[in-house]
Structures are given as structure tokens and as C-alpha cells.
Amino acid sequence: MKKMRDIICLLLALTFFGSLAFGEVNTEKANEAFSRGLEAYSDKRFLEAINWYTTATSFGHLGAPSFIGHLYVDGEGVSKNLTLAYMWYQIGAAAGFKDSEENRDRIARVMDQDSILLAKKKAKICIESLYETCK
């Protein structure tokens, strides 16, 4: 449990300082939404966690998209869906979050090209809709 807490604290610090580099970020709201997502995840309220992580992403939290991607890879609270996982990792990678980039590239090795293209299209739509259309 302590190791998990340390990892979460490290991710929070990395995303906080990474978010500062992007300017148009509401760090306080992003971190609050992300923390609520972590609480929901800890309580196994996975759909609520996704909603909070999406809100955190909309406020500029760099790590939140990776957490959503992990839920889709593992099928926690949602059906396993590598296309949606790739979409969320792509969103994080586009913002400069290294974990998202690494995870996106990892799952791409087991995806077909059509699914990857669809995921990229979905990521673009999600970002352009300000995270309202992310399915």
C-alpha cells in the first residue's frame, strides 16, 4: 500500500509540474478532480473514476488520460477496449505525458492498423469537443 501511495504521489508531482508548462491549465481544479478520481478508483467506483479523470483532463491534468487508458486495458468498470485505451493514451501523449506515450506504443503492437487509425480519430474528436465526446 505504501508503494502504491508513493507511486501516486510521484505521478501527481510529475503531472502537476508538467501541467505548469502548458499554461492554460487550472492546476487546482485539475488536481482536485484527479484526487476524486483516485478516491473513486480506490472504492472500485470505476465509472465515476473515469468521469473524474475526464474532468481532470479537461482542466489540463497530464496523467489523468493514462489512468483512463489503464481502465480500458484492464476492463475495470468498462469492457476491455484497446481502441479507447489507445485514444486516451494518445490524448496524454499529445499533451507530453511520457507514460501515456509508452503505454500507447505498447498496446499498438497488438492492435491492427484500422483500430489505431480509429483511435487517433476518436482522440481528435475528444479533444476538439473539449472532452464531451470521448467514446
Language model regions located:
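Hydrophobic face of amphipathic alpha-helices that form TPR/SEL1-like repeat modules
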Residues: N31-S42, P65-D74, D105-A108
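TPR alpha-solenoid repeat register
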Residues: A64-S66, V78, S100-E102
